[in-house]
A protein has these predicted regions:
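Beta-propeller domains
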Residues: 1-155
Length: 155
């Protein structure tokens, strides 16, 4: 039924006389363990895509306290890593207005820092390189939310 080129993942329609017809899925691991809250460029929803963005859990793995980008074709990853006191929200991909490439845009993630004298902030990353472009620090605490969305201003 479906095979992804260069991947071990597949979806096959199976006929079974006892159970009827069903779809058998075979998954494939991409990247390192610990990747969570995956997001893609929404312009690629329902279409082939190459990059997925996510966060690392709070375990001791590779993605811990990170915002990550994984190339699903190669399995290679890039990350921005905070410190052990910072907790990051789900990343939100914001496409550049004149984007040509899939990863042409920025990643937004709120970062809550549990230390008393360290500010919470909105993190802005270059989606292609995962390098920090800037941050907007706030006075006070930013509620640690798991999910986020970017809504552009309507003109």
């Amino acid at each position: 039924m479906v095979r992804v080129p260069g991947s071990l993942a597949s979806a096959m329609k199976v006929k079974n006389n006892q159970d009827g017809t069903y779809i058998s899925l075979v998954g494939a691991d991409i990247g390192e363990p610990g990747f969570d809250m995956p997001q893609i460029n929404e312009r690629h929803t329902g279409k082939p895509y190459r990059y997925v963005y996510g966060t690392g859990g709070y375990d001791r793995g590779y993605f811990r306290n990170s915002v990550c980008k994984v190339d699903v074709e190669t399995g290679r990853s890039l990350k921005w890593q905070g410190n052990e006191y910072q907790y990051l929200s789900e990343p939100t991909f914001v496409s550049a207005p004149d984007a040509v490439d899939e990863d042409d845009g920025v990643i937004l993630s709120s970062v809550a820092d549990v230390r008393k004298d360290s500010p919470d902030f909105l993190l802005v990353l270059n989606a292609r390189t995962m390098e920090e472009l800037g941050r907007a620090e706030i006075d006070g605490q930013l509620p640690n939310s798991l999910h986020g969305v970017f809504l552009p201003e309507k003109h």
